[in-house]
From Swiss-Prot:
Region (Disordered): 1-22, 34-64
Keywords from the named record: Ribonucleoprotein, Ribosomal protein
Record-level GO BP terms: translation
Secretion signal, residue range per the UniProt entry: none
GO MF entry, a single one: structural constituent of ribosome
Organism per entry: Mycolicibacterium paratuberculosis (strain ATCC BAA-968 / K-10)
A single Gene Ontology CC term: cytosolic large ribosomal subunit
Basic and acidic residues biased stretches: 34-46
Biased composition (Polar residues): 50-64
PANTHER family in alphabetical order: 54S RIBOSOMAL PROTEIN BL35M (PTHR33343), LARGE RIBOSOMAL SUBUNIT PROTEIN BL35M (PTHR33343:SF1)
Record-linked NCBIfam families: rpmI_bact
Family: Belongs to the bacterial ribosomal protein bL35 family.
Protein name: Large ribosomal subunit protein bL35
Gene3D superfamilies assigned to the protein according to its UniProt record, in alphabetical order: 4.10.410.60
Length: 64
C-alpha cells in the first residue's frame, strides 16, 4: 500500500506541538481590521489549541 499523503491545506493551517497537541491561528484577523476594536484584535493574537472534538479529524489529515 502506498504512503498516505498529508492534506496540504491542513498542513498549512495546523501545527503539532512537541507534546502532541494541535494548534491553529485564530480567525478574523486577516483583513478589514480598521473597524474592529483594538481589544478584539489583541484577543485574537497568537495561536490556540484545536478542540478535542476536532483533534481526531485533524490528526487523520496530518497522517498522525
Amino acid at each position: 500500500m502506498p504512503k498516505a499523503k498529508t492534506h496540504s491545506g491542513a498542513s498549512k493551517r495546523f501545527r503539532r506541538t512537541g507534546t502532541g497537541k494541535i494548534v491553529r491561528q485564530k480567525t478574523n484577523r486577516r483583513h478589514l481590521l480598521e473597524h474592529k476594536p483594538t481589544t478584539r484584535t489583541r484577543r485574537l493574537e497568537g495561536r490556540t489549541t484545536v478542540s478535542a472534538n476536532d483533534t481526531k479529524r485533524v490528526n487523520s489529515l496530518l497522517n498522525g
